[in-house]
Amino acid sequence: MSNFIVGLTGGIASGKSALAAEFEKLGVPVVDADVVARQVVAPGLILDAITNRFGQGILLPDGTLDRQALRKIVFADPTERRALEAITHPAIRTELQRAAKAANHPYAIVAIPLLAEAGARATYPWLDRILVVDVPVALQHARLMQRDGSTSALAGQMIAAQASRAQRLAIADDVVSNEGNTDQLAQQAQRLDATYRAALQTHRIEN
């Protein structure tokens, strides 16, 4: 059971998944908010609530969620998007905390791409540390164009739609710079792993 939880976040194309993978190599369990978000909308109470709000048109013939149909609705209207978030986000947060605490390791990492946008510790008060993967905006832009084949304009729009680099750094307890190569990222993960294991001792004494 994990009694120490680290929230991992970063902007688009910053290398969140790469850093999470380095922690996993060290045996640290990583709970991914994107995966949990997909699990939460499986057939059940949450999907029933979504269907009641948005209608049967957001279901596929087999009764599962038609993500594309729902996406069209919520992206076209901010009010509808907020209505969806009001249904799904509390369930996602609850499951993230449950899964992290249930992990069979001294500490766990919860990967939350939009942690800054969601309110950081005001929304996730159970996070013991917040770790931000940081890259310059110009590098984010270049990676998006290379990775996804995005146009320069689209890459700029995607970056602008998220919290700013300064806003993410403002919520950080720890920062990993991902301007270098995989070896450098691995070294930073190893350093932080040692830091978190040491912090666990203090955490246990205080609690």
Swiss-Prot record:
Major enzyme class: transferase
Pathways per UniProt: Cofactor biosynthesis; coenzyme A biosynthesis; CoA from (R)-pantothenate: step 5/5
GO BP field: coenzyme A biosynthetic process
GO cellular component: cytoplasm
Subcellular location: Cytoplasm
Gene Ontology molecular-function annotations: ATP binding; dephospho-CoA kinase activity
InterPro entries, sorted: Depp_CoAkinase, P-loop_NTPase
Keyword match Transcription regulation: no
Pfam families listed in its UniProt record: CoaE
Domain DPCK intervals: 5-207
UniProt keywords, alphabetically: ATP-binding, Coenzyme A biosynthesis, Cytoplasm, Kinase, Nucleotide-binding, Transferase
Reaction equation(s) it catalyzes: 3'-dephospho-CoA + ATP = ADP + CoA + H(+)
Binding residues annotated for ATP, in chain numbering: 13-18
Record EC number: 2.7.1.24
Alphabetized NCBIfam families for the sequence: dephospho-CoA kinase
Biological role stated in the UniProt entry: Catalyzes the phosphorylation of the 3'-hydroxyl group of dephosphocoenzyme A to form coenzyme A.
Family to which this protein belongs: Belongs to the CoaE family.
HAMAP family, per database record: Dephospho_CoA_kinase (MF_00376)
Protein's UniProt name: Dephospho-CoA kinase
Source organism (scientific name): Xanthomonas campestris pv. campestris (strain ATCC 33913 / DSM 3586 / NCPPB 528 / LMG 568 / P 25)
Lineage of producing organism: Bacteria, Pseudomonadati, Pseudomonadota, Gammaproteobacteria, Lysobacterales
Gene this protein is translated from: coaE
